Amino acid sequence: MREHRPVIALDFPSFEAVKEFLALFPAEESLYLKVGMELYYAAGPEIVSYLKALGHSVFLDLKLHDIPNTVKSAMKILSQLGVDMTNIHAAGGVEMMKAAREGLGSQAKLIAVTQLTSTSEAQMQEFQNIQTSLQESVIHYAKKTAEAGLDGVVCSAQEVQVIKQATNPDFICLTPGIRPAGVAVGDQKRVMTPADAYQIGSDYIVVGRPITQAEDPVAAYHAIKDEWTQDWN
């Protein structure tokens, strides 16, 4: 099922910065928030508890990648935080992904990273020594993710349709690199607008700087949300 709220990437260096940002929004507004490595390492698990206590949904974006037992144990801890979604690297293998699913349980969605949206095909081939196309690599990882029993993948919006064809229509495709038209793309190579992401079949979109660094973050959020949901029935 598609998520109507754009997921806001809380790319802040401290707990206080998050509090200042969230204070801009009405207290009754429930947001979907992404906590990444920078914030989690700066603020610790308490940041997740804080956001959940405010009534927000949380995507904990730590991209775990380790041996199966270690990932399973880590996921058991994360399950206690009440996160709504978290992720791992598909490159860790099917056994690692299965272990992660077992450790997390079924109360939260578990998705896998295929190829980072900052990765170009040339970079993948040169540094990862994967001698296929970028799309073929993404499809391979998506199939293995589905085989492992996960809920979906993180992928570029350009890859959503082929991933759903290769897996199933309900397989979640969460797409970062979403930018409204006219906004700088930053360090992401494969980007798309919210409206385009909807048309191509994305289930979740992640937006960071176009909201968090906007002159009016609340207005920017609602403009992106309106664009994302404008064609929903």
Curated annotation (Swiss-Prot):
Pathway: Pyrimidine metabolism; UMP biosynthesis via de novo pathway; UMP from orotate: step 2/2
Active site (record annotation): K63 (proton donor)
GO molecular function: orotidine-5'-phosphate decarboxylase activity
Residues annotated as binding substrate: 11, 34, 61-70, 117, 179, 188, 208-209
EC number, as in UniProt: 4.1.1.23
One of the protein's GO biological processes: 'de novo' pyrimidine nucleobase biosynthetic process
Function: Catalyzes the decarboxylation of orotidine 5'-monophosphate (OMP) to uridine 5'-monophosphate (UMP).
Annotated family: Belongs to the OMP decarboxylase family. Type 1 subfamily.
Name of the protein: Orotidine 5'-phosphate decarboxylase
Gene: pyrF
